[in-house]
A protein has these predicted regions:
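Primarily recognizes the serine-hydrolase "nucleophile elbow" in alpha/beta-hydrolase
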Residues: 122-124, 130-175
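Short beta-strand/loop motif that positions the catalytic acidic residue
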Residues: 180-183, 187
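A domain-start/cap signature at the N-terminus of enzymes
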Residues: 15-61, 135-137, 142, 147, ...
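Post-His helix in hydrolase/transferase enzymes
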Residues: 222-232
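Histidine-bearing beta->alpha loop at or near hydrolase active sites
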Residues: 97, 184, 214-221
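Active-site machinery of serine-nucleophile hydrolases
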Residues: 61, 65-116
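Gly/Ser-rich "nucleophile elbow"/oxyanion-hole loop immediately N-terminal to the catalytic nucleophile
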Residues: 49-57, 106-139
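Conserved alpha/beta-hydrolase "acid-adjacent" motif
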Residues: 188-194
Length: 250
């Protein structure tokens, strides 16, 4: 009996054109020409479930950069960790999210490719250009800081976790952007001392980064992406607004 009910459901679905709704986070391939070369980049694109029913709304966008373990040519691996993994079960997440995949053997340094990808998404979707944010973990955290350093007028805020090899020389430009940095005191892969040097450089340049030191935590602090407060904070940041006084470290 159960078998015949299943068959009936399938037949009715075919007759009436019913089908399962597509996933909100879909894989894409980006091909484009930047000066003197072609770029080929796989990425996941998350669009909130309510996007289609809110035609007057321009949405904030998060650019998510994964860590070194997700490099390669299988975009589905990006879906299994960090913010993309969270999105698999949150169709009403209130941001559009772009999650590119870094090619094998490379790190996040291709500014032209990333900026061109963002331009493409902004062309195709209703994006609030004043509320574009960048985040990442480990190698992706370093990439987020680097892209913010190279493109200081693009991003309204930066949120990074367990950042690998941050560069204090970036402090001057990063001081102009709202920053929230998370780092574990027991991180053996990305020592917290390196992040403290960057924070000092940013503060010396007049910046007010928010720096959360996570006592006893190691490199794997991706559960930070489950904290609602970080998204509330992101939405409070808007490009062109003054960087506010330094909030308390918590």
């Amino acid at each position: 009996m159960q078998r015949w009910l299943s068959v009936l459901v399938v037949l009715v679905s075919l007759c009436f054109g019913w089908s399962a709704p597509p996933p909100q986070q879909q894989a894409h391939v980006f091909d484009a020409t930047v000066p003197h070369r072609r770029v080929h980049l796989s990425y996941l694109l998350f669009v909130p479930a309510s996007y289609a029913t809110t035609p007057e709304t321009r949405w904030p966008l998060i650019l998510y950069l994964h860590g070194g373990s997700r490099r390669g040519d299988d975009i589905e691996r990006v879906r299994t960790l960090g913010l993309p993994h969270k999105l698999e079960s949150e169709p009403d997440f209130p941001f559009i999210v772009v999650s590119p995949q870094c090619p094998a053997g490379e790190i996040w340094t291709d500014v032209e490719a990333i900026d061109t990808l963002l331009e493409r998404v902004m062309r195709d979707y209703r994006i609030d250009a004043q509320r574009i944010y960048i985040t990442g973990h480990s190698m992706g955290g370093r990439g987020a800081l680097y892209f913010a350093y190279r493109l200081p007028l693009r991003f309204a805020a930066v949120l990074v976790l367990g950042t690998y090899s941050p560069v204090p020389a970036w402090g001057g430009k990063l001081a102009q952007i709202p920053l929230w940095l998370f780092h574990g005191t027991a991180d053996a892969q990305a020592p917290i001392a390196e992040m403290k040097e960057l924070v000092q450089a940013i503060e010396a340049a007049g910046g007010h980064p928010r720096f959360n030191i996570l006592e006893g935590r190691d490199h794997f602090i991706l559960d930070v992406y489950d904290q609602p407060d970080i998204y509330k904070w992101l939405l409070e940041q808007k490009r062109g607004a003054a960087v506010t006084d330094k909030p308390p470290n918590t």
